[in-house]
UniProtKB/Swiss-Prot annotation:
CDD domains assigned: RPI_A
Xref: HAMAP family: Rib_5P_isom_A (MF_00170)
Catalyzed reactions: aldehydo-D-ribose 5-phosphate = D-ribulose 5-phosphate
Organism in which the protein naturally occurs: Streptococcus pyogenes serotype M12 (strain MGAS2096)
Residues where substrate binds: T26, G27, S28, T29, D82, G83, A84, D85, K95, G96, G97, G98, K122
E.C. code: 5.3.1.6
One family name in Pfam for this protein: Rib_5-P_isom_A
UniProt keyword annotation of Isomerase present: yes
UniProt protein name: Ribose-5-phosphate isomerase A
MF-aspect GO terms: ribose-5-phosphate isomerase activity
SUBUNIT field: Homodimer.
Pathway: Carbohydrate degradation; pentose phosphate pathway; D-ribose 5-phosphate from D-ribulose 5-phosphate (non-oxidative stage): step 1/1
Amino acid sequence: MEALKKIAGVTAAQYVTDGMTIGLGTGSTAYYFVEEIGRRVKQEGLQVVGVTTSSVTSKQAEGLGIPLKSIDDIDSIDLTVDGADEVDKDFNGIKGGGAALLMEKIVATPTKEYIWVVDASKMVEHLGAFKLPVEVVQYGADRLFRVFEKAGYKPSFRMKGDSRLVTDMQNYIIDLDLGCIKDPVAFGHLLDGTVGVVEHGLFNGMVDKVIVASKDGVIVLEAPKAG
């Protein structure tokens, strides 16, 4: 599995050229993309500026010598490469297994080309087998948890050891065990309108390409263009 993740990450790095501002994703597959960019910066003199999606990725990129800028200092990003926890046939996805969904979505939004790197196990018919992360403010989190519980969403607080995990943005994550999300777009809108929810892990209609690595090789799936 790790070998497939590495293949997907390295393949995505081929889309990066001199002068680009690139979004650096978070997670076990995006890790290999960042590593390959670091190698190219060092060995090939690749000239890029990175924008990171988590403190973990910032630390990795700094260690590799990749120049970084804050999201607040740029107007657009040429290319962002990130992982995904599930991707359906309509190019909707669930992200946030690494607890970085808010920053990942903030970086994805001004991106001209958004690429996900996955192994074949992440491609699914319907989203929802992977728990859906919902980032919530700490104030009122337990009340919101009860709302989700009453709605039948089977919520659980993301933990780190014996304590609730706190994200880079100082929020909690409530994971929803939904089984199958029949209409990801509608459910995303529902969560968007829920007071106390900062962001959720449904990335609907955002991705442009999905690089899928399997034992049979690598395929690049292109999302249909809107309109």
